[in-house]
């Protein structure tokens, strides 16, 4: 279980529930598949999948949860085709115009008819609570998926106050300075990919498999373009992309880290999961600290709001 994307949130209050208590709170919201007329459903599943039954997996102050979502696949083009056919039938058979309001009613009826026959797709979003650092780390590339998990967590727990982890210095400013000044924080190396944006006209230039210190890249920065995505390597152990929202994407754990999990022989899938989780969380905890420091520390919360 190696996270590939990170969206990180600060808990504004300590998380007081034990893993056992959290399991009991999540259990009533266990995932159930979509019924015939449900467009989508979400609920909690064991992080260990079929190898576990608990809705949490905890180790060393880190508590992992897994939120599963299922939705019916009902392409808008299919609904539109059925609607146009129905409207044409009414116009021909009854020799009258179909109003906008009636079209909306017909559309709802068509969706109601098609839903039971629709295929489904599902995804599982993993996250863990770092009780020591008061963080929620979500394995999600999109903010929407992370927000869905947090909304479900609030529904189960009752209250889960948190805010995005924002650094003091704006990420585009820091990332641009790395290339402009040809310097980067200790423990970090530049990768070979970045995305530059022109604030005035929105023009975007994407650089891949390229030396980011090259004159060609610097010339774009000298014209006023800023970096809103950049590839870095943390302590030769993790490759990642940092974006302008301080979200981390396309994480790749190098062998130097993965070998730590493989060095202790696991006798079961559950033990292997536990070892990987323990190592991953320790490494990510330190990486997050280093990256926050590289961007000037954590933004101070406004306690007046």
Curated annotation (Swiss-Prot):
Subcellular location: Cytoplasm, Nucleoid
Any one GO cellular component localisation term in the record: cytoplasm
Gene Ontology molecular function: any one: double-stranded DNA binding
Top-level taxon: Bacteria
Protein's GO biological process: DNA recombination; regulation of DNA recombination
Main subcellular location: cytoplasm
Keywords: Cytoplasm, DNA recombination
Function: May be involved in recombination.
Stated family: Belongs to the RdgC family.
Protein name as catalogued: Recombination-associated protein RdgC
Organism from which the protein derives: Saccharophagus degradans (strain 2-40 / ATCC 43961 / DSM 17024)
């Amino acid at each position: 279980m190696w996270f590939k994307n990170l969206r990180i949130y600060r808990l504004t209050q300590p998380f007081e529930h034990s893993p056992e208590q959290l399991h009991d709170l999540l259990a009533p919201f266990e995932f159930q598949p979509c019924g015939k007329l449900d467009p989508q459903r979400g609920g909690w599943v064991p992080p260990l999948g079929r190898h576990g039954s608990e809705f949490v997996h905890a180790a060393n102050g880190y508590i992992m949860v897994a939120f599963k979502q299922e939705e019916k696949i009902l392409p808008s083009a299919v609904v539109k085709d059925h609607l146009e056919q129905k409207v044409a039938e009414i116009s021909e058979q009854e020799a009258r115009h179909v109003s906008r309001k009636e079209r909306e009613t017909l559309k709802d009826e068509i969706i109601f008819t098609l839903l039971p026959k629709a295929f489904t797709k599902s995804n599982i979003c993993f996250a863990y609570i770092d009780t020591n650092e008061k963080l929620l780390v979500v394995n999600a590339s999109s903010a929407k998926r992370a927000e869905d998990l947090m909304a479900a967590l609030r529904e189960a727990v009752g209250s889960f106050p948190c805010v995005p982890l924002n650094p003091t210095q704006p990420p585009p400013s820091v990332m641009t300075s790395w290339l402009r000044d040809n310097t980067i924080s200790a423990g970090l190396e530049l990768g070979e990919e970045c995305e530059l944006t022109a604030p005035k006209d929105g023009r975007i230039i994407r650089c891949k498999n390229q030396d980011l210190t090259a004159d060609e890249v610097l010339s774009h920065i000298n014209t006023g373009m800023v970096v809103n995505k950049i590839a870095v390597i943390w302590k030769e152990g993790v490759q990642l992309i940092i974006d302008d929202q301080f979200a981390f994407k396309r994480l790749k754990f190098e062998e130097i880290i993965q070998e730590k999990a493989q060095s202790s022989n696991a006798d079961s899938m559950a033990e292997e999961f536990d070892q990987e989780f323990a190592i991953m969380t320790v490494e990510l905890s330190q990486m997050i600290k280093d990256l926050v420091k590289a961007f000037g520390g954590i933004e101070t919360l406004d306690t007046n709001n």
